[in-house]
């Protein structure tokens, strides 16, 4: 008999994925990383900002343990406020995904290994839906609120 997991337990387990994703975003050059970035009625699990000269590149990552369809829907929505949108899940879950669905949506797929390191299974495509005014507003707010400034 399989033990049922409460939504509180799931959120706690999803939070265990935050630090590895923060480390990954730092590794690709993000100089600001904000967990639980508000976007309308949603909370982007991890939002990364890479400032390079006059251009800012932004990343949104939706963390999920199992519900990949929900993660895909959320990550697709986040393409409005970031340049690159990803989902991140434990490796054993990612191995069973049909990546063509994510590729078609332009959403990338990250996996978290049991040792806490992160790999990229599918690179995100630069969003064609990004609204610069959302990105600029979120970036300005993050200058003051970033919990993981590098």
What are these regions (language model features)?
Residues 65-112:
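Catalytic cores of nucleic-acid endonucleases
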Residues 21, 46-48, 57-67:
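Conserved catalytic cores of phosphodiester-cleaving nucleases, focusing on short active-site segments
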Residues 23, 105-150:
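Non-catalytic C-terminal interaction segments of nucleic acid-processing enzymes
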Residues 49-51, 112:
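A generic structural motif
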Residues 1-42, 52:
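Acidic-basic catalytic patches of nuclease active cores, encompassing PD-(D/E)XK
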Residues 35-36, 63, 112-114:
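Conserved beta-strand termini and adjacent loop/short-helix elements that scaffold enzyme active sites
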Residues 56-57, 81:
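Short loop/turn motifs at secondary-structure junctions
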């Amino acid at each position: 008999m399989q033990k049922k997991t409460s939504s509180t337990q799931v959120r706690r387990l999803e939070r265990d994925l935050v630090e590895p994703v923060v480390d990954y975003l730092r590794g690709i050059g993000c100089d600001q990383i904000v967990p639980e970035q508000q976007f309308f009625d949603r909370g982007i699990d991890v939002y990364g900002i890479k400032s390079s000269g006059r251009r800012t590149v932004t990343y949104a990552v939706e963390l999920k343990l199992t519900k990949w369809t929900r993660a895909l829907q959320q990550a697709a929505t986040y393409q409005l406020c970031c340049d690159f949108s990803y989902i991140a899940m434990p490796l054993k879950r990612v191995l069973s995904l049909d990546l063509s669905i994510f590729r078609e949506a332009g959403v990338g797929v990250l996996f978290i290994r049991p040792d806490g390191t992160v790999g990229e299974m599918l690179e995100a495509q630069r969003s064609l839906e990004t609204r610069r005014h959302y990105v600029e507003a979120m970036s300005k707010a993050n200058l003051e609120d970033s919990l993981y400034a590098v």
